[in-house]
Amino acid sequence: MKLSVYGKGGIGKSTTSCNISVALAKRGKKVLQIGCDPKHDSTFTLTGFLIPTIIDTLQEKDYHYEDIWPEDVIYKGYGGVDCVEAGGPPAGAGCGGYVVGETVKLLKELNAFDEYDVILFDVLGDVVCGGFAAPLNYSDYCMIVTDNGFDALFAANRIAASVREKARTHTLRLAGLIGNRTSKRDLINKYVEAVPMPVLEVLPLIEDIRVSRVKGKTLFEMAETDPSLQYVCNYYLNIADQILALPEGVVPSESPDRDLFALLSDFYLNPSKSHVMSEDEELDLMMV
């Protein structure tokens, strides 16, 4: 099974991806997480350091694939999760999609691509160009990380459009949304009413999720010394269980940009009597 995780930049994709990878490993699966971001920090909370990238290794070996061994590019992370960082081209040059393709090519050359029960691609940012949509070509499911804010859901809608486009020629489905660190889900609910899709989980506003990223540890590792965090791990285990159940998923029909802008704006500008706009939501609106 191959999964891709997308979402607005800074929404918590890598933290979410690492914890889902560990949750899948806890369920007995052999997992490989591939970071698809030039920052090459996707697997930081699994390994505790920035591992060398595949593109750097290829350059060192002058692109002689036969001179590269699995241990040169695959690093063992927490919970037995194997980790790879694709890396990226120099800033302002090259194509990230090419780097993803080279990563998959090398892993296949090493007979590693098909050795795992689950491969999870953690993909940068919210601008899904043809290059960084490349992981969708290899994926069975896409998961979109969001929060209860305008910008994150607007980005989710654009990613849903990419899933729909790729599903024309690939066996790709959208597994659903994952709400990350949000105290409410009313705007998420409003969005999925307009664009029907599953909501796999909504994680509450838990500060330890953010802290885990800074510490370079997953919530599962932190829970070993602080059992009170086990309830947070259960959110990720629930997501893993849903994915392992092989959900039908959906081919989404995204909302036109202007329609979605009007829908989400109206939610803020004309709140229902039961909805009182919070200071955080007012700030979100000011940033639009």
UniProtKB/Swiss-Prot annotation:
Gene Ontology molecular function terms on file: 4 iron, 4 sulfur cluster binding; ATP binding; metal ion binding; oxidoreductase activity, acting on iron-sulfur proteins as donors; oxidoreductase activity, acting on the CH-CH group of donors, iron-sulfur protein as acceptor
Pfam families the UniProt entry points to: Fer4_NifH
Keywords, in A-Z order: 4Fe-4S, ATP-binding, Chlorophyll biosynthesis, Iron, Iron-sulfur, Magnesium, Metal-binding, Nucleotide-binding, Oxidoreductase, Photosynthesis
Pathway: Porphyrin-containing compound metabolism; chlorophyll biosynthesis (light-independent)
PROSITE patterns to which the protein is assigned, alphabetical: NIFH_FRXC_1, NIFH_FRXC_2, NIFH_FRXC_3
Reactions catalysed: chlorophyllide a + oxidized 2[4Fe-4S]-[ferredoxin] + 2 ADP + 2 phosphate = protochlorophyllide a + reduced 2[4Fe-4S]-[ferredoxin] + 2 ATP + 2 H2O
E.C. designation(s): 1.3.7.7
NCBIfam families associated with the record: DPOR_bchL
Protein name: Light-independent protochlorophyllide reductase iron-sulfur ATP-binding protein
Lineage of the species this protein comes from: Bacteria, Bacillati, Cyanobacteriota, Cyanophyceae, Oscillatoriophycideae
Gene name for this UniProt entry: chlL
